[in-house]
Design a protein with these regions (language model features):
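Bacterial N-terminal signal peptides
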Residues: 23-39
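Flexible glycine-rich active-site/ligand-binding loops centered on an Asp-His dyad
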Residues: 199-222
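Short strand-turn-strand beta-turns centered on an Asx-Gly dipeptide
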Residues: 192-196
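N-terminal secretory signal peptides
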Residues: 45-115
C-alpha cells in the first residue's frame, strides 16, 4: 500500500524538557488496521510498531475500548515512546470545529472525539528510562501550551494533584506502560503496568485537558493530530 509521508518539524525545545518530549509523532490511524494487517476475513488483534505490540481492544473496568490511533515518538535515531489512543466507541472524529458539542466539557474548537461519551485511555509505552519529574513536567507543559492563562489557572489545583500522582509513579523503566484513563462518573486514573497509582482526579474536563496535549489547538503538528483522530494516514520521519 502506498503511504503518504509527512516530515515532522523540529521541536521548539530540547527533547528531554517538558512538552518537547511529547512532540514529533509518527502516526497511523486505527481504521486502516484491517487493510494493513488483515488476511482475508481475519482482522488483526494487535498492531506492532517499533517492536511494541498494542492490542486493538482492551478491557477497562467493565468497558471495552478500541484502538483509535497509535504513534511512535522519536527524535532522530532515538525512539522515545509509543502512544496508543483508545475510545469506547471507535468513531473517526474530524479535527474541524463545526461539530456541535454534546459534552459540556468540550470546547467548540475541540475535535468530535471529545464529544463522544464513555471511557477512554491513553497508553504510553516507554522506550527509554524516565524520571517522575520528566513525566510530570511533560504533562504539565503540554496542558499549559493548549489552554489560555485563565483556564490553565483554573486547572492548576488538579494539575498539582496529577504531579503528585506522577511522583507516586516514580521513575519508569524502558518497556513500562503508562496508562492515563478516564472512567465515567469517577475521573482520571493513572496506572503503571496496570497498577493504579495515587488518587482518581475528578472531572471529564480535566481528562480532556490532558487529551489536548496531542489533540488541542497547539498539538505537536496539525497533520499528526488529524492522523491520531483517524482522518488520514501519516507516516513521518525525522
Amino acid at each position: 500500500m502506498q503511504h503518504n509521508h509527512y516530515v515532522s518539524k523540529p521541536a521548539r525545545k530540547t527533547i528531554f524538557s517538558g512538552a518537547a518530549f511529547l512532540r514529533t509523532l509518527i502516526a497511523v490511524p486505527a481504521f486502516l488496521l484491517p487493510l494493513l494487517l488483515a488476511t482475508g476475513s481475519d482482522v488483526a488483534r494487535a498492531v506492532d510498531i517499533a517492536d511494541i505490540r498494542l492490542p486493538d481492544s482492551v478491557p477497562l473496568d467493565g468497558y471495552n475500548l478500541a484502538l483509535h490511533g497509535y504513534a511512535l515518538r522519536r527524535w532522530g535515531p532515538a525512539r522515545l515512546y509509543v502512544i496508543g489512543l483508545y475510545t469506547e466507541k471507535a468513531e473517526r472524529g474530524s479535527a474541524s470545529a463545526d461539530t456541535a458539542s454534546s459534552a459540556t466539557s468540550a470546547a467548540p474548537s475541540d475535535p468530535k472525539l471529545f464529544t463522544i461519551p464513555g471511557a477512554k485511555r491513553v497508553t504510553l509505552v516507554l522506550l527509554r528510562d524516565l524520571t517522575a519529574r520528566q513525566l510530570s513536567d511533560a504533562l504539565n507543559e503540554g496542558i499549559r501550551d493548549n489552554h489560555d492563562d485563565a483556564r490553565y489557572a483554573a486547572l492548576q489545583p488538579r494539575i498539582e494533584r496529577l504531579i503528585k500522582v506522577m511522583r507516586e509513579v516514580g521513575s519508569a523503566r524502558s518497556g513500562s506502560r503508562l496508562h492515563i484513563d478516564f472512567l465515567p462518573g469517577q475521573g482520571t486514573r493513572v496506572a503503571l503496568d496496570d497498577n493504579p497509582k495515587g488518587e482518581i482526579i475528578e472531572g471529564e474536563d480535566f481528562y480532556l485537558a490532558i487529551l489536548r496535549i496531542w489533540l488541542g489547538p497547539r498539538p505537536p503538528d496539525f497533520a499528526l493530530k488529524q492522523a491520531l483522530l483517524g482522518s488520514g494516514a501519516m507516516i513521518g520521519t525525522r
